């Protein structure tokens, strides 16, 4: 059997096993081991590759960025920073058409700039924003749809766990990826906000239960001083992490350490943390870190198996013969990623697709920082699309209202999926949106 045939069968086996429910990292390791064995005809070569990849993949101080930003995210969640951000946005925006929807988007954008996990945003704002919108007469479908849609900002606005993973797989600067995600994240938040205003103006019954917002007399306005105090932790975290990163004071790892220290101080000052909850936060951080570490190790083995087979070079030559230009390649790539997003999770898509597609992106001369932002947006669309739609399932499991079905949530996310797709096309055809803040684009 030729190496190309082995690699092709490995890809098919991998997708089948993941779809059957096998853990992604285990699938990557097992399929890669068998693939190397078949290519080289010697199981000892495959075993040596496993051992070497385990050492090479994460033996770097740069990898410290993963547990630090994960820890920051769990600490700000327990300190109710997201809840406070929503309360401030609610006070400022609720009198606008679709104001609570815009407030949800705005507070999600703030929360995204502190924690890099979309499902954390989905869980927090399902508990905080959905009951408030229902109280004001918003349509249940819209309420859950806007939470699901805006939760994807958590993976685009830095810090972002997906961008960290992309940085490791593509050997790109995590700091540059974070900086490149700022403007696209803000553009997506703005697109959501404008879309909500248009929906509330042109199709009010898609936003409000009875076509108009209901007054809630038991919702007193908070004093300005209280609003400032509620927003202060978010401002401190964003200024210390993103401000320090963009100004060049910190590397990505140092920014993660700073964010974790500030988040810990906020949680302690607010008396939201005791020994039991601290242990819980540290345990959850350990679980996520080990999971990501194992994924990266196994992805390294998979990448080396593909390189050994010659599959990336074969695909580059094949596409060159087809005469496909950079835009054509990118549109096919984005379509593939979105389709995969309907059946497997975000991390799995990156781990499976990038080792094959990065050589082609380089062959076409694409900026890999911009390519990373486009990839993350395309992958995140999968969080909202059936049948997988991870954010949708998180919202359903967190939601206390049994009247809202899974189908309602998927239908509610449809307008936001379309808006996200429009922003994705804008990013593809206007690359400077993601490169404008970089001091040395692509560096």
Please give the residue ranges for each predicted region.
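Alpha-helical transmembrane segments of multi-pass membrane transport proteins
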Residues: 1-443
